[in-house]
């Protein structure tokens, strides 16, 4: 087994505790700054993303193959950017898209998100390498860090997080 090289994330990447605090201080009526999702749809999207990392959402073979070939380059570029600098309105895997006609229950999505934060925080603390359904084996820090990055991007979309410096973590 080869050594897993860790990604460099910016210093403004929030912890799971900071993400929990941000979402618990918000509500279903949080106004979006861009995009088309409502706050409950965003939280369901974030939960679907978390579920995909846990293997709860199937990933098609062609997407897995493409992700294994190109994913690490893409992920390293994303990790080096602040969640504030992540491009808006990027393409989303169909299984993770939120239909505009679906109106999720904020409280249910919040409970699911809080449960996921506990699971991913425990994974990060344990430090055991993880098998990502699309990108293959990666460190627990990267596995969790990519999720925190994605979540922070969407929390910024709804003004749930304030901006911070963009220095790289070692």
Language-model features: locations:
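Alpha-helical packing segments of well-folded alpha/beta enzyme cores
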Residues: 19, 46-49, 109-116, 147-150
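Extreme N-terminal tail/first-helix region
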Residues: 1-24
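Conserved, structured core segments of small domains
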Residues: 31, 109, 113-124, 128
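Amphipathic, non-membrane alpha-helical segments in soluble helical-bundle scaffolds
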Residues: 9-16, 32, 36-40, 99, ...
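Short, contiguous alpha-helical
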Residues: 29-83, 125-170
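Short, helix-capping/interhelical loops that line the mouth of catalytic, cofactor-
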Residues: 2-8, 56-108, 112
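Short hydrophobic/aromatic-rich motifs at helix boundaries and adjacent loops
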Residues: 21-22, 86-89, 122-126
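Structural signal for well-ordered, non-membrane alpha-helices
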Residues: 20, 24, 50-51, 114-121, ...
